Amino acid sequence: MSKIFVNPSAIRAGLADLEMAEETVDLINRNIEDNDAHLQGEPIEVDNLPEDMKRLHLDDEKSSNLGEMVRVGEGKYREDFQMDEGEDPNLLFQSYLDNVGVQIVRQMRSGERFLKIWSQTVEEIVSYVTVNFPNPPRRSSEDKSTQTTGRELKKETTSAFSQRESQPSKARMVAQVAPGPPALEWSATNEEDDLSVEAEIAHQIAESFSKKYKFPSRSSGIFLYNFEQLKMNLDDIVKEAKNVPGVTRLAHDGSKIPLRCVLGWVALANSKKFQLLVEADKLSKIMQDDLNRYTSC
């Protein structure tokens, strides 16, 4: 009777596929729950109406005063009733942003460029805000306390802005000083820290978000891993990817970035499971080879 031998690496690959399928189902369920989160809020009840509105009564004996009171109410509370009763503009705006986010993900998965999608989305958001949140008329006279508060707020805003400007420079210094994975040579440096670079990195990562990459395992075999298994936001992945030597320069030039190297870098820094599975020395060599191959092109 013949015996059938099964390669251990095939078993490990099958187990990895099953685990990835379970994690994908969990990720889809969490996305569905997050998208429906705004539907679980309690309705807002308006208990206190303006005094002039409380005095409105449908009384035949006071029909002459009714029209006068309505005109007063319209003049005094015109801004309070621009939207339908019971509609909170903040909730509507949050729901609108949720739909915009879902639409962006769909367009990116269909292959559209991120910069084009983002420019169109910004125009739509600005148009929505302009229509539904018009600027209130400025008052001709303000008391001294209001002016003082405005000046203090301006100072706080200026100081906060200066702190935010200093953060990227500090981040670049830390990225240059911090050591990388073992045996990974720092042969390139990050450059051009701007929004266009982040957009290009995000676009390339999003296109390959579900693609599986091979990594060396501690058991002298290989295992498959992708960006979805990180369970991280795309923005956080991009921020971590910018610390990979040479990635920002490649993205600034519009070149392809070494996605397997980026995935290994981010996973090694944020995934304990990945750290337990991967062979660190072999991973460092693979990442260095990928980086050298892409930067030499």
From Swiss-Prot:
Motif Nuclear export signal location, chain numbering? 49-58
Q: Where is this motif: Nuclear localization signal?
A: 211-214
For region Disordered, the annotated ranges are 133-177
> Which intervals carry biased composition (Polar residues)?
158-169
Q: What Gene3D superfamilies does UniProt report for this protein, alphabetically?
A: 6.10.140.1560, Phosphoprotein, C-terminal domain (1.20.120.820)
Q: How is it modified after translation?
A: Phosphorylated by host PKC and by an unknown kinase.
The record's GO molecular-function terms, alphabetically, read:
RNA-directed RNA polymerase activity
- Cellular component annotations (GO), alphabetically ordered: host cell; host cell cytoplasm; host cell nucleus; virion component
Basic and acidic residues: compositionally biased ranges: 139-157
The domain of life for this entry's organism is Viruses
Name the segments for region: DYNLL1 and DYNLL2 binding: 138-172
Q: What is the effect of changing residue 179 to S?
A: In strain: Isolate PM1503
List the InterPro entries hit by this protein, alphabetically: PP_M1-like (IPR004259), PP_M1_C (IPR037199), RABV_P-like_C (IPR049506)
Q: Which keywords describe this protein according to UniProt?
A: Chaperone, Cytoplasmic inwards viral transport, Host cytoplasm, Host nucleus, Host-virus interaction, Inhibition of host innate immune response by virus, Inhibition of host interferon signaling pathway by virus, Inhibition of host STAT1 by virus, Inhibition of host STAT2 by virus, Inhibition of host TBK1 by virus, Inhibition of host TLR pathway by virus, Interferon antiviral system evasion, Microtubular inwards viral transport, Phosphoprotein, Viral immunoevasion, Viral RNA replication, Virion, Virus entry into host cell
The task this protein performs is described as: Non catalytic polymerase cofactor and regulatory protein that plays a role in viral transcription and replication. Stabilizes the RNA polymerase L to the N-RNA template and binds the soluble protein N, preventing it from encapsidating non-genomic RNA. Also inhibits host IFN-alpha and IFN-beta signaling by binding and retaining phosphorylated STAT1 in the cytoplasm or by inhibiting the DNA binding of STAT1 in the nucleus. Might be involved, through interaction with host dynein, in intracellular microtubule-dependent virus transport of incoming virus from the synapse toward the cell body.
What family classification does the UniProt entry report for this protein?
Answer: Belongs to the lyssavirus protein P family.
Q: What is this protein called?
A: Phosphoprotein
Q: Provide the gene name from the record.
A: P
